[in-house]
Amino acid sequence: MAFDKDAIIASLKEASILDLADLVKAIEDEFGVSAAAPVAAAGAAGDDAAAKDSFDVELTEPGQAKIGVIKAVRDATGLGLKESKDLVDGAPSVIKKDLNESDANDLKSKLEAAGATVALK
């Protein structure tokens, strides 16, 4: 049996979508392969995290000392008392966006010192 690529392509062009789906399934079963698209390697995601240059500081939990956390949020953001309280009460909430690593870590330390649980994203 000779392999004629052009004839196969012409046959595929004339086939219906259902016929092509059946063909793909038959090829997967016959050869033990999958037609699924390959996913990115986990190592690449780790490299992106290491190269990240801007961080969002997210208040995940205000903790027991909510008043201290509200004061820390107010000092860090320059917001009014009500806006700061709303941010803390609405946790999880982003306190500041697009900070460099040192500023994000400083803010995280201040909020944690006030009793909050904080994540950098």
From Swiss-Prot:
Pfam families referenced in this protein's UniProt entry, alphabetically: Ribosomal_L12, Ribosomal_L12_N
Keyword Transcription belongs to the record: no
Gene Ontology molecular function, alphabetical: mRNA binding; structural constituent of ribosome
Coiled coil: none
Gene Ontology CC: cytosolic large ribosomal subunit
Keyword Amino-acid biosynthesis (UniProt): no
CDD domains reported for this sequence: Ribosomal_L7_L12
One annotated GO biological process: translation
Job of this protein: Forms part of the ribosomal stalk which helps the ribosome interact with GTP-bound translation factors. Is thus essential for accurate translation.
Family per similarity comment: Belongs to the bacterial ribosomal protein bL12 family.
NCBIfam families named among the record's database cross-references: L12
Subunit structure: Homodimer. Part of the ribosomal stalk of the 50S ribosomal subunit. Forms a multimeric L10(L12)X complex, where L10 forms an elongated spine to which 2 to 4 L12 dimers bind in a sequential fashion. Binds GTP-bound translation factors.
Protein name as annotated: Large ribosomal subunit protein bL12
Organism field: Oenococcus oeni (strain ATCC BAA-331 / PSU-1)
